């Protein structure tokens, strides 16, 4: 499967689990990016190469990675650990919901509104399943 194929698989699987999703396909590389619940549950990077340190994606699906690992709060998953990544993403959202309660959804709306005026990901991303 290609990086783009994995992106659409993730979008489909995460939609099933109730996430609001935006996605972006990079122009200069084959990398793809998914924002979870307008960023409240962080983001996913899908790639076959090391990313830039200034963009700290919490969840990374790495094509060609032999073994999954964690480094400074960032998680790098091999294709073999795809299902573990889905479970970890769901667990992280559950922790955010426990922490913020109903405010979680208020933060989503705030990020959605503020994101409309931002450059970068927000201006180029496509909505996959915006239910808000």
Residue map of PLM features:
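Negatively charged, low-complexity tracts enriched in Asp/Glu with abundant Ser/Thr
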Residues: 1-41, 68-83, 94, 99-132
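Intrinsically disordered, low-complexity regulatory segments enriched in Ser/Thr/Pro
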Residues: 41-91
